[in-house]
Amino acid sequence: MTCIFLFLSLLLHSADPGKENVLPESDALQDPPSHKVWDQLLKKYVSPDGWVDYRGFDEDREALISYLEILGDHSPTALWGRETVLAYYINLYNAATVLLILEHYPLESIRDIPRPWGKKRIQIGDQRYSLGEIEHEILRKMGDPRIHFAINCASLSCPKLLAQAYAEETLESQLEEVARGFINDPSRNDFSGEKPRLSRIFKWYRKDFTTRKTSLIDFLNRYLPVPLPAKAQVSYLPYNWALNKKRH
């Protein structure tokens, strides 16, 4: 994991002109990969409401594998912008999750797969990573809690898989869209009663949504049409791990 922390440190300091780029020149000149293939696959096999046609996806498995190989050959460098890096890792996580499901399909839940988030299955450069490492050691450390609404764990209670690839130039609007959509989805969060019932994502990753000056309620109120009281007491809904597959 040493290279992950080195890369993140370089990324966080890349805006400082006084910092020297210590990456090898060949890596520093590497351009970000295109996400066009992934975008086309998503538009073809994911419905607007997030249902995934895994049977159809499997017909294009080779295209998905090729896309992941391209990402693996284009590991991020300190010269990439923050939005470029975020889009890269979100797309990588989601594409790798779809491939993981295809490799074990048919199944009823991602949790039917041994160590779905713990096994190192993802090649980036000369190292292998697990889905858990991509999420916890890279994406979460980049400090944007909205990634929790962008990465998809192939389950009904997860944020839906967006039917388009994330891209540097549209990332901000995409993250705002998925955050607002997830928070206001009554199947994932229930604000109908006196006591809000939230997705367990807000329980598991509560510290990602809070700062010294802002609470979880403050974060939620950014996206709710009717703000919650500052001292609202919340509870959490059960998490449905059933596969987010399209019903044929």
Each predicted region: which residue ranges?
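Sec-dependent N-terminal signal peptides of Gram-negative exported proteins
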Residues: T2-A15
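Interaction/scaffold regions that mediate signaling and macromolecular assembly across diverse proteins
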Residues: D16-H248
